[in-house]
């Protein structure tokens, strides 16, 4: 059984960065990159035939945690760590590695030397022009920024002018499409019978040339019952979608010039029966389709793990038309994609269409 961090997939880049999978001629080659532990493997994707063909494998210094493509789509930046997930046993090997993508074949080759990180990275991304790499760490919660060298290798850390409040349990860091704000998603922790809830927040910074300043915290209700995990942006509208892990919600915030409006514009349930939770369920990754018409969210870890696809339009964004893909066989890991095999019949192997969750609607 693979854990969420042991197995991670980038399906033609569309999961890690939606803009990576913009509309392309059907004749263009499509590549899939997936990892098990420290091994990152390239697969050719036959879209018409729904087949995968295994190609080369690149070994990272430790288990892959996350990966993000350079804006040129010629390189991947891969965060790896030997630490256990969450607050588990701490390891000693934490890195960012650059990997070159052959523009003709999609083949992967290591590019330069990895850089060391202080602790386990939970998420990695770049700013819009990929001049800087942003890394989120969960234990302790923090965010750091590293330069991208002229040869596209990861470089030195950028010194920040002041202290940063990184909240509790950072889960993701992203730069807004205009490259003017950086957002650190901090989930907090659920309360227990013996411990009070740790509040969650969206930590919003002014961003310029790798420097984070003027931090503002968005924390409805003081961060209580607000456990954000992951966010994504609409490709053409000033809308930001945030999955709220601990409350199983999907929120939408409006982006304004130089700020995120702190008011929750719209919200939706991610569960069909939010008042009848039979096992711990948690809203996970969220991604907006490149055409802006669909928002995809993951619910985990109740077996089997599931996807939810919410349909949106310019005027009304509704989840009434959706598809659920269910991993098979059931497992308790949070991985979004089962392990591919050579010539498997579909980019997502061992999946089946299931019935849609009950209707929920988000209005513009």
Ranges and model annotations:
Residues 35-36, 86-93, 138-141, 192-200, ...:
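Short, solvent-exposed loop/turn segments at conserved positions within beta-propeller repeat blades
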Residues 53-58, 110-114, 158-163, 214-221, ...:
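A short beta-strand motif characteristic of beta-propeller blades
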Residues 44-49, 100-106, 147-154, 206-211, ...:
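Short loop/turn segments immediately following beta-strands, especially the blade-tip
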Residues 61-72, 117-129, 163-181, 222-239, ...:
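Beta-rich, blade/repeat-based domains predominating
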Residues 288-326, 338-347, 359:
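Loop/turn-rich, solvent-exposed surfaces of beta-rich toroidal or solenoidal domains
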Residues 1-15:
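N-terminal secretory signal peptides and thylakoid transit peptides that target proteins
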Residues 109-174:
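Asp-box/WD-like beta-propeller blade repeats and closely related beta-sheet repeat scaffolds
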């Amino acid at each position: 059984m693979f854990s969420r961090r042991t197995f991670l997939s980038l399906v033609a880049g569309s999961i890690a960065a939606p803009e990576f999978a913009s509309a392309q001629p059907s004749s263009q080659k499509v590549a899939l990159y997936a990892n098990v532990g420290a091994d990152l493997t390239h697969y050719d994707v036959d879209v018409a035939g729904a087949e995968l063909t295994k190609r080369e494998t690149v070994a990272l210094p430790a288990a892959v945690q996350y990966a993000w493509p350079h804006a040129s789509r010629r390189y991947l930046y891969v965060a790896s760590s030997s630490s256990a997930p969450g607050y588990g046993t701490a390891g000693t090997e934490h890195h960012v590695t650059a990997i070159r993508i052959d523009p003709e074949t999609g083949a992967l080759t290591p590019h330069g030397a990895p850089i060391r990180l202080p602790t386990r990275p939970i998420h990695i991304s770049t700013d819009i022009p990929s001049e800087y790499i942003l890394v989120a760490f969960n234990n302790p919660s923090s965010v750091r920024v590293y330069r991208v060298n002229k040869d596209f290798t990861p470089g030195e850390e950028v010194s920040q002018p002041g202290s940063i409040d990184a909240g509790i349990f950072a889960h993701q860091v992203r730069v807004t499409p205009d490259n003017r704000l950086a957002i650190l998603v901090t989930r907090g922790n659920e309360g227990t019978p013996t411990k009070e809830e740790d509040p969650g927040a969206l930590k919003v910074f002014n961003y310029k040339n790798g420097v984070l300043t003027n931090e503002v915290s968005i924390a409805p209700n003081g961060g209580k019952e607000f456990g954000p995990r992951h966010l994504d942006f609409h490709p053409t509208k000033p809308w930001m979608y945030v999955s709220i892990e601990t409350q199983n919600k999907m929120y939408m915030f409006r982006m304004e010039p130089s700020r995120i409006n702190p008011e929750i514009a719209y919200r939706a349930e991610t569960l069909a029966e939010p008042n009848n939770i039979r096992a711990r369920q948690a809203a996970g990754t969220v991604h907006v389709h490149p055409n802006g018409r669909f928002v995809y969210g993951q619910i985990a870890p109740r077996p089997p793990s599931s996807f939810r696809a919410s349909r949106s339009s310019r005027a009304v964004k509704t989840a009434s038309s959706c598809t659920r893909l269910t991993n098979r066989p059931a497992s308790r890991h949070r991985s979004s994609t089962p392990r591919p095999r050579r010539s498997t019949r579909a980019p997502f192997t061992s999946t089946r269409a299931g019935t849609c969750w009950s209707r929920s609607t988000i209005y513009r």
